[in-house]
């Protein structure tokens, strides 16, 4: 089974790809889809659409896990929600089942506390995937944590 975890955003979409082989979690890839901040919102959303389609075609994940978004009073709220909509649409188009997780649920599952720090989450991701270096940028570490949350739910602790 192969999973892709997604940390949504308009400027950067973090992704992390993990595979289960012989009951073990194997790190495959992580990174970010970065959009051109000098382009309009529609063009940036299209970049996310294109690049996520390319990632899916390359890695062929069986399932996806995406961070749930909660509304905060922020100027970026609408942009993130729009980006997340594009992400969900791509998975629907590719017939990939999506599970959604709140940030506090990811932190609790991965680091043992719903209020875990960014550092604690990164350390837990490194431990769970036997990584010697922290995934960079942080958006990709978050995406791996989201994927690990789904795998934990599936019984791969």
Swiss-Prot record:
<keyword id="KW-0238">DNA-binding</keyword>
<dbReference type="Pfam" id="PF02075">
    <property type="entry name" value="RuvC"/>
</dbReference>
<dbReference type="InterPro" id="IPR020563">
    <property type="entry name" value="X-over_junc_endoDNase_Mg_BS"/>
</dbReference>
<dbReference type="GO" id="GO:0006310">
    <property type="term" value="P:DNA recombination"/>
</dbReference>
<keyword id="KW-0540">Nuclease</keyword>
<keyword id="KW-0479">Metal-binding</keyword>
<dbReference type="GO" id="GO:0006281">
    <property type="term" value="P:DNA repair"/>
</dbReference>
<feature type="binding site">
    <location>
        <position position="139"/>
    </location>
    <ligand>
        <name>Mg(2+) 1</name>
    </ligand>
</feature>
<dbReference type="GO" id="GO:0008821">
    <property type="term" value="F:crossover junction DNA endonuclease activity"/>
</dbReference>
<dbReference type="GO" id="GO:0005737">
    <property type="term" value="C:cytoplasm"/>
</dbReference>
<comment type="subunit">
    <text>Homodimer which binds Holliday junction (HJ) DNA. The HJ becomes 2-fold symmetrical on binding to RuvC with unstacked arms; it has a different conformation from HJ DNA in complex with RuvA. In the full resolvosome a probable DNA-RuvA(4)-RuvB(12)-RuvC(2) complex forms which resolves the HJ.</text>
</comment>
<feature type="binding site">
    <location>
        <position position="7"/>
    </location>
    <ligand>
        <name>Mg(2+) 1</name>
    </ligand>
</feature>
<keyword id="KW-0227">DNA damage</keyword>
<dbReference type="GO" id="GO:0000287">
    <property type="term" value="F:magnesium ion binding"/>
</dbReference>
<dbReference type="GO" id="GO:0048476">
    <property type="term" value="C:Holliday junction resolvase complex"/>
</dbReference>
<keyword id="KW-0233">DNA recombination</keyword>
<feature type="binding site">
    <location>
        <position position="67"/>
    </location>
    <ligand>
        <name>Mg(2+) 2</name>
    </ligand>
</feature>
<comment type="function">
    <text>The RuvA-RuvB-RuvC complex processes Holliday junction (HJ) DNA during genetic recombination and DNA repair. Endonuclease that resolves HJ intermediates. Cleaves cruciform DNA by making single-stranded nicks across the HJ at symmetrical positions within the homologous arms, yielding a 5'-phosphate and a 3'-hydroxyl group; requires a central core of homology in the junction. The consensus cleavage sequence is 5'-(A/T)TT(C/G)-3'. Cleavage occurs on the 3'-side of the TT dinucleotide at the point of strand exchange.</text>
</comment>
<dbReference type="InterPro" id="IPR036397">
    <property type="entry name" value="RNaseH_sf"/>
</dbReference>
<feature type="active site">
    <location>
        <position position="139"/>
    </location>
</feature>
<keyword id="KW-0460">Magnesium</keyword>
<dbReference type="GO" id="GO:0003677">
    <property type="term" value="F:DNA binding"/>
</dbReference>
<dbReference type="InterPro" id="IPR012337">
    <property type="entry name" value="RNaseH-like_sf"/>
</dbReference>
<keyword id="KW-0234">DNA repair</keyword>
<protein>
    <recommendedName>
        <fullName>Crossover junction endodeoxyribonuclease RuvC</fullName>
        <ecNumber>3.1.21.10</ecNumber>
    </recommendedName>
</protein>
<keyword id="KW-0378">Hydrolase</keyword>
<comment type="similarity">
    <text>Belongs to the RuvC family.</text>
</comment>
<feature type="active site">
    <location>
        <position position="67"/>
    </location>
</feature>
<keyword id="KW-0255">Endonuclease</keyword>
<dbReference type="InterPro" id="IPR002176">
    <property type="entry name" value="X-over_junc_endoDNase_RuvC"/>
</dbReference>
<feature type="active site">
    <location>
        <position position="7"/>
    </location>
</feature>
<keyword id="KW-0963">Cytoplasm</keyword>
């Amino acid at each position: 089974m192969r999973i892709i975890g997604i940390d949504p955003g308009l400027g950067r979409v973090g992704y992390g790809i993990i595979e289960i082989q012989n009951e073990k979690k194997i790190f495959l890839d992580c990174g970010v889809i970065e959009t051109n901040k000098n382009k309009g919102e529609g063009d940036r959303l299209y970049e996310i659409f294109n690049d996520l389609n390319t990632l899916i075609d390359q890695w062929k994940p069986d399932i996806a896990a995406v961070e749930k978004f909660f509304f905060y009073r922020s100027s970026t709220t609408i942009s993130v929600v729009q980006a997340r909509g594009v992400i969900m649409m791509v998975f629907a188009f590719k017939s990939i089942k999506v599970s959604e997780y709140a940030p506090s649920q990811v932190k609790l599952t991965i680091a043992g506390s719903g209020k875990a720090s960014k550092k604690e989450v990164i350390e837990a991701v490194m431990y769970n995937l036997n990584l010697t270096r922290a995934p960079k940028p942080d958006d990709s570490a978050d995406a791996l944590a989201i994927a690990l949350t789904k795998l934990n739910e599936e019984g791969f602790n």
